[in-house]
Each structure stands twice: as C-alpha cells, then as structure tokens.
Amino acid sequence: MVSIKTDELSERLRDRAVRPQTRQVLVSLIAGSEQEGDLSEPPNCNGYGRVRHFRYETPPPWPKNPLPMVPAAQYLGRPVEEVSNAQVFQNAACNWRCWYCYVPFNLLAANEQHAGWLTAEELVSLYLAEADRPLVIDCSGGQPDLTPEWIPWMMEALANAGAAEEVYLWSDDNLSNDYFWRFLSDEQRQLVGTHRSYGRVCCFKGFNEASFAFNTKAAPDLFARQFDLFARLLDTGMDLYCYATFTTPQGEGIERDMATFLDRLMALHPRLPLRLVPLRIENYGVVQHRVGTEQQTALALQEQAILAWNAELAARFTTQERQLPIVSISLLE
C-alpha cells in the first residue's frame, strides 16, 4: 500500500484552505453534497452547516460517549440533554483518508467547487441567524488544524458578537501536524489554551502502527507523532479529550498491543485513558462504498479490540475511577 505523504499534502492543502490576510477559511458546502443524504435534517446556515445529534448511549461493551455534551453542559450550566446537538461547520481539507470517515472525500480536498470562502464573523452570523440553534459549535472537518487560525478567529468572532458566554466551542484534531505552533502567534496560542468555553478532542487513529496505517493511509511511523503532538498540546493547558478507533486488519497480538497503547497514553498522563472514548466504527452512508473484505475484517476485529481495552482499563483503574465523569478527570495535575 502506498502511504500518503502527509507533510507534503498538508502544505498543499493548507495553501488552498486558508487565507490569513483576509481571515477566510474554505468551508465545505454540505447542501447538494453526497453527505447531505446521510443527514437526519437538511443543512442549515446557507448550506454550509449541519446540526449533529450526538449519542451518549452505545451498544455494550462499548463505553458511553459523553463528548462533547458533558463538557458543554458543565460550562454552560445546562442539562446534558440540552446540549446533545451541535452546529457543525467543516473545513474543506484533510491530510488523511480514513476509510470510515463519514465525509465524502471530495469534501476533504480543498476543492472550491464543493466549498466556499467564509470568515469566522460570517459563520457566527449565519449561526446566530438560526432560530433554533444549538448551544455548541463544532469546528470539524476535514482537519481543522490544517487551518489552526480558524479556532482563535471563531473565539474572537463569538466575543465580538456578544455570544462567547452562551456558546461552547468544540473542535477535532487528528494529531497529524504542528501547525498550531507553526502558524499561530503567541497571543493566539494563549487564547486557545486558556479559553474557558472551548474543548478539543484529539483522535488516535489506531492502537498500533498497523491499525493506524490501515485506517489513515498514512505512513506507520506517524503513529508515534500522534503521541508527541498530544504531549505538546497538553503543555498548553487546553481542555483536551481523546477519541480512539480500534479497527484493525489483523487480529494477532491485539491484547499485547492494546496494553502497550495504554502504556503510551499513561506515559503522557497517568489518567489520560480515563479521558479517552473509544469510537465504534459503523458501516453506513458514504462509508459503505469504501468497505471491502479488509474493512469488513476490521469492523469485526474492533469488537475484539474493545474487550482488550476494557480489560486493560479495569486492571489499571478502580471501578470508582472508571465511573468518574470525564470532566472530573484532570490532566493538569
């Protein structure tokens, strides 16, 4: 399998996905796209947005997914059910091609035929114009950190609109590049790192090199980079959470490699596994076109992998620790 040249592709996509001088980001046009057919309600915000309904419950033995509802509920002082929906905007570029991604690949290629140039102020205006708008804005993708300016721009736009205290901002990060440090000013990094109404979820795209490379089409050695980048983000003081996907093409050594995965997480912070939510990959929507024999095997093997994760978690943490609300687990101590 030929690997994506991640760093080269990242540079090309960034050049086509952000205009720092005019503070514009290339945002996917969801209306009229293949993705629109998978939505439970029509796109909003002139076709550039969608409302995502987050699900807390998952089929056993998969752990419940409290993100981003529980952090949002804590900040906003609202019941979790009031923040289970989010206003999603997707930047139109991603440097990896995860086969299970729910976004059509033509919305990840920084193609202006399927996207539009918008400022954070324009996105916030579109959001505020929605009559029944969610209390959470999810800056998704794509890979938002190909355009890291987007997050501080959104924070500033919400503040200027007088909405900063009533909206919880959330973003995804696939832990693939150092653009947060390369392209943001000290002031912007400080803003993002200390912003009270912001949370970031970082996705580990596997539990070993083989699963990572299979899932992303990136070089296997970039799996180690994910841990290095998370360590740097942790130093910012940002409110961080994690996802992990356990789809893997090979069943041999799952228990051993899962133990090593937790070792590496705990080397970053002893409580980090308690802030990580494993995601069960499902075969639906645009994903169905990408599923062949290998992917079917991976979908089955993730069920073995989650048992290994649960066993390791039970061996390393008490029942009381595992039942703590995710927001009660500090990574700053």
Q: Locations of the language-model features?
A:
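Auxiliary Fe-S-binding modules of radical SAM enzymes
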Residues: 1-45, 221, 228-333
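Short strand->helix junction
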Residues: 108, 144-145
